């Protein structure tokens, strides 16, 4: 049976932010003709960690500089209490900015975003739109809950009730359940599932899993409401940025409502929807998704003209979602 070091064969890197160690993967080629390669920054959501991107890092790091942080409270990063760390969206964006600045990554960035990582990554992009070269969107969001999409009951319980706190922090229900329901083609291998849940192994170490859910704004006045609205408004700056969307249509949270939200906001995006895949699309359809991402980055290595990037956006915006089925 595979060990974590076998499944996740990367050197551990750490940066100290506000007294807390943030772990990140940093894999890159030796150099291409002395020129620094484009950076591919992969931002995970909840309840996962940098492990989610392990196969993508291995597929891209021969050509690109891959950076994958574990948010504070997740993965191999420190997991401080509320008295020592501000578990909020704004702080997550600050952390990502601090990490990238420490690595002197300030241009030619490809953002790969999943789950709440979309909000964090696009929050960073809103601050520095000129740094973003490409977007890769995987079952994620950078805007509020669509009006047509009620908050799923399971998330509402986790977000708003004492029972939810007990289930998430006492029994690791959120992370454990996600490792089962987040894939649809086939169950996760036991060693992979254990790797997903391993960092969240105690009441203290599950704090971020709960705080992420509690950080979701649902109405004006909620913490993050104004910030999420501003991130949403900033998306209009990226309608000429090459974008690819790879989406599992069996995601019970980030479903067609969110996908259609992206199509409305970024009509230039290339779309590949997988009818038989769930939330963890990099587990369900790893080979297909990675092949699409490699091709997409290679094809956009030379920036296209604005006219090419935005050709016929009205047609793209109104296009019907065509599921990929078992293969795309």
How does the language model describe each region?
Residues 269-308, 312-315, 321, 328:
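Catalytic active-site module of serine/aspartate enzymes centered on a nucleophile-bearing elbow/loop
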Residues 27-79:
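Conserved HGGG/HGGXW glycine-rich cap/lid loop of the alpha/beta-hydrolase fold
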Residues 41-45, 114, 247:
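The conserved beta1-alpha1 loop
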Residues 205-264:
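Conserved serine/cysteine hydrolase catalytic core
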Residues 107-149:
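Conserved hydrolase catalytic core segment
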Residues 25-32, 68-113, 291:
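Active-site loop/oxyanion-hole signature of alpha/beta-hydrolase fold enzymes
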Residues 3-21:
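N-terminal cap/lid segment of alpha/beta-hydrolase-fold proteins
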Residues 147-211:
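Helix-rich cap/lid subdomain of alpha/beta-hydrolase
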